[in-house]
Amino acid sequence: MRTHTVVVSAVVLLRLAVVADHAGAQDPPYPAAFVLSSASRVRCLDREARRLMEVAIAASPTIARQVTDLQSTDLIVGVETSSLQRKTRGEARLIGATPAVRHVRITIRIPGARFDLVSVLGHELQHALELAAAPDVRDTVTLRAHYLRIGYEPLGRGYYETDGALEAGRRVSAELAASQPDRRVAAR
């Protein structure tokens, strides 16, 4: 079976605006310890990704809900931190699919300020939820058709963007701004 690698990028061309939407915020039904375990559908692939996820779940009701929502999908989402090209702060890749499960890898570019990294994580988790909502997306052809239907390709070359992911990043930024007076904490 041939594995297709597809990039769903968070090419953030705009500075994230701070908007707040705390209506309907609820505690997630899964504790952070479960979400960070190997039984979770969202798995941290390195130590920095785990630290980032711990901060994100604690500080952002949006991210806590996203991770909870991913538990009931056919996706296994691996989250890692790594260096990426300069214009790309994060990306979600469909890395493979079987009849029962699809694998997505989210990469968050480091180094960076933790506040910004958490916002990018929320953006990329939204892309994972967009994929989860489209069970027919299983390869590069169906992924491209899906993202051209729900979003756009701002820079070409297989990088896609959606208004939903941009909004998720803005919402997470607002949640962090409301909960953390000091945003300058470095990731590394």
Where do the model's predicted regions map?
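Positively charged n-region of N-terminal signal peptides that target proteins for export
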Residues: 1-4
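Soluble non-cytosolic domains of exported or imported proteins
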Residues: 111-120, 155-163
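Short amphipathic C-terminal alpha-helix that caps PH/PH-like domains
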Residues: 121-125, 169
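Active-site scaffold of zinc-dependent metalloenzymes
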Residues: 82-116, 128-131
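A metal-dependent hydrolase signature that marks the N-terminal structural subdomain at the beginning
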Residues: 21-96, 100
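Bacterial N-terminal signal peptides
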Residues: 7-18
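Catalytic Zn2+-binding segment of zinc metalloproteases
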Residues: 125-141
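Metalloprotease/metallohydrolase-associated module, dominated by Zn2+-dependent proteases
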Residues: 80-94, 140-188
